[in-house]
């Protein structure tokens, strides 16, 4: 059922400037497109809200609304998001109880899987009703056409390749009914029968199929007391086609290390090129970072030596979380928003005195690409010279009565005042409204917070590629023209900041003309030949 690894490399996801990045460089996509590195015929944002969550969200808006960069944008989301405003298609997807899905978490030293199921579909089917798709059950139950994602991709693949001539459809055909469209129950039946060790035997002991077992219990313990994985002996099938380096004893397969010989046994070792715990990293030396081959202190962009207090510069910590909210996914939780709906700027009293502000006053926080206006909370919980503003808050919508639930969003005016220069101003905050939930008329708070992430430039670490969230800012008392919730961003400056950070990188190729070390894992790993740059 799985297609072979692709023999192509997508540089819009895995740019050659970041050969050691663990994940794709998705937050840089608007800047890659702006540079002309490519264009997208269709972009799917899947349960992803880059306009709000990512840094530099206005550059995302510019890219998503420019058909020379993104021809079409489909937003797959279980809840409305700021990104959905700038989509050609908004496709409602099911929450955890509205879809089939597999999940696991780091709860204890064990390997286990959980099986989510669309409860309304199952309930209606137990009443004798039949459905071809989960969205049909949701429509029957009054939810509307809410799809589950697995069925969407199956159906889309058959629509794109109806006769199979493109070679796509065959990966979405039933393993039990050759040539027929894969059904959602068959998809999970095959997984449970073929790729979950021990599940078929456990199910058989109760007279159940693996699928029925998971439908009954919803979870399965694959392996308990999982410790010392580096000592795990490799199986004969894992060793097939492998070679052993006579000097290092590293076991390699398809050019990548999979284990190491210890006392005559091939064991998994650690996920490094040497399969040992590495104090010295030959990879960093080979990829032209010799100064970081052993652990050491790296002076960051917000190190105190890089903060000029005489100019009013401070360090902003924008990443601390509230225990009540989750990114932009908890806006519908009315009780949680009743508890937490503000994200003031935490400021030490010494800094408040220097700025001439007290708790509740407005300050302007200036970043490299813009500013936001927020209220002050003076507290000795902060260190002088450092401010903090919590995540989660600052949700917004562009229309009064639709496009974002009203429990958590402020109505805003967003406009481009000059090319690349964007201004957002709050029209009004959260207000009571009439709905089938009587609590909506009892809303007693107005504050929706301030969207600070819009004002952050992308700051990709030159080695790992991960975004460096901490910001060097200048804080001042708000002017007479400033209003609470104001956000201003210059995307021209944002692109200049991107270029400045890009110049810090040391791009591929590496040894043997590689785009990326062969030993490093990555999602949707291409064929080995795709790792090599053309030429030479």
Give short role names for the model-derived ranges:
Residues 121-204, 330-346, 350-536:
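Long, contiguous, secondary-structure-rich segments that constitute the structural scaffold
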Residues 90-95, 99-100, 365, 385-386:
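Short hydrophobic/aromatic-enriched beta-strand-loop microsegments
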Residues 59, 86-89, 152-155:
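Alpha-helical scaffold elements adjacent to nucleotide-binding pockets in ATP/GTP-utilizing enzyme cores
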């Amino acid at each position: 059922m799985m297609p072979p690894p692709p023999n192509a490399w997508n540089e819009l996801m895995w740019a050659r400037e970041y050969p050691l990045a663990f994940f794709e460089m998705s937050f840089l996509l608007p800047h890659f497109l702006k540079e002309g590195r490519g264009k997208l015929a269709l972009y799917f944002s899947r349960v992803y809200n880059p306009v709000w969550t990512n840094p530099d969200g206005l550059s995302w808006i510019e890219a998503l609304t420019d058909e020379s960069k993104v021809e079409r944008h489909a937003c797959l989301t279980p809840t409305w998001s700021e990104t959905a405003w700038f989509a050609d298609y908004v496709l409602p997807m099911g929450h955890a109880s509205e879809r089939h899905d597999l999940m696991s978490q780091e709860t204890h030293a064990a390997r286990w899987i959980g099986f989510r199921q669309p409860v309304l579909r199952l309930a209606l089917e137990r009443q004798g009703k039949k459905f071809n798709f989960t969205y049909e059950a949701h429509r029957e139950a009054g939810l509307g056409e809410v799809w589950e994602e697995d069925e969407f991709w199956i159906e889309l693949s058959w629509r794109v390749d109806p006769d199979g001539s493109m070679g796509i459809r065959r990966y979405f055909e039933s393993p039990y009914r050759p040539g027929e469209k894969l059904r959602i129950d068959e998809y999970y039946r095959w997984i449970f029968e073929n790729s979950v060790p021990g599940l078929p035997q456990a199910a058989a002991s109760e007279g159940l199929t693996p699928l029925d077992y998971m439908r009954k219990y919803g979870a399965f313990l694959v392996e308990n007391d999982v410790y010392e994985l580096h000592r795990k002996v490799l199986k004969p099938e894992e060793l097939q086609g492998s070679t052993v380096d006579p000097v290092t004893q590293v076991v390699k397969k398809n050019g990548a290390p999979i284990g190491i010989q210890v006392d005559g046994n091939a064991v998994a070792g650690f996920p490094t090129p040497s399969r040992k715990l590495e104090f010295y990293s030959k990879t960093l030396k080979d990829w032209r970072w010799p100064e970081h081959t052993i652990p050491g202190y790296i002076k960051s962009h917000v190190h105190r030596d890089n903060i000029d207090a005489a100019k009013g510069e401070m360090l902003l910590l924008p990443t601390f979380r509230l225990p009540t909210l989750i990114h932009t996914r908890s806006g519908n939780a009315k009780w949680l928003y009743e508890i937490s709906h503000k994200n003031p700027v935490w400021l030490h009293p010494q800094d408040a005195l220097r700025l001439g502000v007290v708790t509740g006053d407005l300050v302007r926080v200036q970043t490299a690409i813009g500013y936001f206006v927020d209220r002050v909370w003076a507290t000795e919980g902060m260190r002088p010279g450092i401010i903090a503003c919590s995540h989660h808050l600052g949700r917004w919508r562009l229309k009064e009565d639709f496009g974002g639930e009203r429990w958590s969003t402020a109505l805003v005016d967003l406009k481009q005042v000059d090319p690349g220069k964007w201004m957002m101003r709050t029209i009004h905050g959260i207000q009571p409204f009439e709905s089938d939930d009587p609590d909506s008329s009892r809303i007693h708070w107005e504050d929706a917070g301030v969207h600070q992430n819009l004002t952050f430039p992308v700051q990709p670490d030159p080695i790992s590629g991960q975004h460096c969230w901490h910001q060097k800012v200048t804080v001042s008392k708000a002017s007479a023209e400033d209003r609470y919730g104001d956000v201003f961003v210059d995307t021209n400056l944002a692109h200049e900041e991107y270029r400045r950070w890009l110049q810090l990188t040391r791009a591929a190729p590496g040894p043997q003309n590689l785009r990326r070390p062969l030993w490093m894992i990555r999602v949707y790993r291409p064929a080995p030949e795709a790792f090599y740059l053309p030429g030479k």
